[in-house]
């Protein structure tokens, strides 16, 4: 409330007090205002209301942190990543330790918030979620257009860590190709007794594939017809690969596509932060470093909060 409005009300209350002898606080209560309001107004008589929203708080992001955030996000090229991804990426790289909600407000305030990735549709989760690496392996083929010719990308994806264990780019969708991938994955992880989750393609229902799975001491499960969510982890990885790599590059044949896709797979496993696993990399989760990395981030955030408190305390003194 402005000073003129408050002065007009208090003047009227005082006039009524002189006429009736009723205490001003009681008259305030007749107006539906707490008695404490009169004491507050009387204590700062003839003084404009001063809101404290402009007073720096100890948890405010410092100007230097804001500058670094604006510079980093302004120069970040991949606008398909959301603000949560950028928040934890900056924590890991030591740019600034701010929570996603804080980064959201800074981006909004500085006009650095373009159209990010669309929110995922709420879907069924399919099979029970794995609790450790090499418990569930997902596999499938995906079309990749290379110089006007269709190739077929296939991989084995760990369901717990989202790590791409093995992959290749084939010219056909023969069952032998997927059998080679499963064999390679078993050679890399001989102690694994994973459940291979796949669709109902003929490559996965053939006698040769089923015999190979039994011989390698693995298990297999087919997804329900017309229910791609059951194999959604590998389907989502295929979509990410096409969005971030395939549609951005121009391949001159399969020999040119393989090394470029290989570099992206290495980036996906070792550098790209994955939203489904706490914005960590698949390699970190697969190696059992999830709790260690989350604890490291919590420590960084704690020290950043303490540094901000010290900064604003020194500014006030």
Language model features: what each stretch is:
Residues 4, 37-136, 286-290:
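Basic, flexible linker segments flanking DNA-binding modules
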